């Protein structure tokens, strides 16, 4: 297994050559900040045609950029990409002909894909990602003579595409890990412009910051923390004799209503929108559930992300054909709340809207739904 030493010490500032691991100020790039001359005459290879891949490729093409989609022979996405009017080649051929290689396949297969395409990277080319895992944890070691950047829309691919077509934008992230040409950041911002991110704002970050905050958020709050909280609340009510249906509504279904309020206007908007009874109960009881011991566990989870413990565990799990993952996933799918919720979700009109399940990403890890 390749060593998972983190690589923040090699991240350098584009203009000054200084460490950009910790940015003192947050820079947000908009349309006026983008100079399209840094991408307009270049060819982009988009490796993968899943959630993010199809959005990047189509948005780039509609912005006048020469795009090649890189898919292995036999990929089920080849016909779809061609039907969308895009040229399709193998990943190796696409990378060989491109100036920018955007790697939009799952984290777990990126190292193998890189092995297949690295000989096609010429000095001055750009190796681009939408998530920093494999660079940050040293699973991909790029050539020293290429730029390494990140452009990561903060939404599932179908929304990135839909917003672009509507003349709107999707917020995103841009980062520079390796800048050999001196223009890596300008090119990344131009790419973000071409896929529609600078319409809303592209936030500057680093590979370390994006990777570590993304993994922590998924584990402690969004995917791990939220689902564990929902299940514990559901089980508490059911064990106390309340109906599973009522427990489902109170602990899972209504969570969306609260999150939507927080999404739209922050915590204050949520508190201002619920009843006084709900507000007082939440303010006085919430910290009894999420207490200092939970904070200590969160800090432990963050430490495991920062020092590479989680990365090593996940890499080993995949190398062993995912035994723990398979067992845990099966147990989650067998939980009573799943059987209770299925007929209840049919009561809502949005359950008939297929777009709610259209190639959704795993939180902010856009490559997770990408094809090969």
From Swiss-Prot:
Pathway note: Amino-acid biosynthesis; L-isoleucine biosynthesis; L-isoleucine from 2-oxobutanoate: step 2/4; Amino-acid biosynthesis; L-valine biosynthesis; L-valine from pyruvate: step 2/4
Residue ranges of every copy of the KARI N-terminal Rossmann domain listed in the record: 24-205
Domain KARI C-terminal knotted: 206-351
Binding site for Mg(2+) 1: 214, 218
Positions with a binding annotation for Mg(2+) 2: 214, 250, 254
Gene Ontology BP term (one): isoleucine biosynthetic process
UniProt EC number: 1.1.1.86
Record has Metal-binding as a keyword: yes
Region (Disordered): 1-25, 351-372
Cofactor(s) recorded in Swiss-Prot or TrEMBL: Mg(2+)
One family name in Pfam for this protein: KARI_N
Biased composition (Acidic residues): 10-19, 352-372
NCBIfam families: ilvC (TIGR00465), PRK05479.1 (NF004017), PRK13403.1 (NF009940)
Function: Involved in the biosynthesis of branched-chain amino acids (BCAA). Catalyzes an alkyl-migration followed by a ketol-acid reduction of (S)-2-acetolactate (S2AL) to yield (R)-2,3-dihydroxy-isovalerate. In the isomerase reaction, S2AL is rearranged via a Mg-dependent methyl migration to produce 3-hydroxy-3-methyl-2-ketobutyrate (HMKB). In the reductase reaction, this 2-ketoacid undergoes a metal-dependent reduction by NADPH to yield (R)-2,3-dihydroxy-isovalerate.
Protein family: Belongs to the ketol-acid reductoisomerase family.
HAMAP family, A to Z: IlvC
Listed name of the protein: Ketol-acid reductoisomerase (NADP(+))
